[in-house]
């Protein structure tokens, strides 16, 4: 495998996926990023077996191929290179040579066939959601996610697609945050799922202000297709508590306050 690529494009592509790589894994292959070069583009994939991110960037592919290289080390090397073209050359022993200007680095990789395969979503339930809308709903709820690992089903956000609405809920038993918005989808596509905390954070980071995200659900996994990036996550197995019963339905008194002024006052307190 051999390709040349802009340093910044290379770095952006790596950083987009490398955040899911765990530094405490017992499987060496999970410390690596999978790199596939073909058809004028390079695809990066990283996973910790619970969350997976894969993304594509343009490149000048001189020889097609696939390899896995140490993710953190590769990011560290590329981030220190000058703003110029970077050449990556990988031999049949999965040894990579990275060159940029007068700098040259050698990395030992692992065979790509040892890297976990991406799951299939052919039989998935599919939704189309505005990226900015989903990001805003996450922002308004994720702070209430429980960090108590003994309450496993609360270690994420509940996503519900019912009655023409998308509802996101998080609670730690003391606070409860709910964001609900209208969404068009077939009536038979009623669904409830719990997305883990790590996937929630990665999803918020990847979502943009414009465009649509394609959301796919199977029985135990979810996939979010955002432009040229795909995030896949396992879902939390369990039933989210009935939060509706703790939300007051009849309030005797209500107060309307200017949102901006209230926020500034709270910050000063």
Role assignments for model-derived ranges:
Residues 1-269:
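Structural preference for solvent-exposed beta-strand-turn elements
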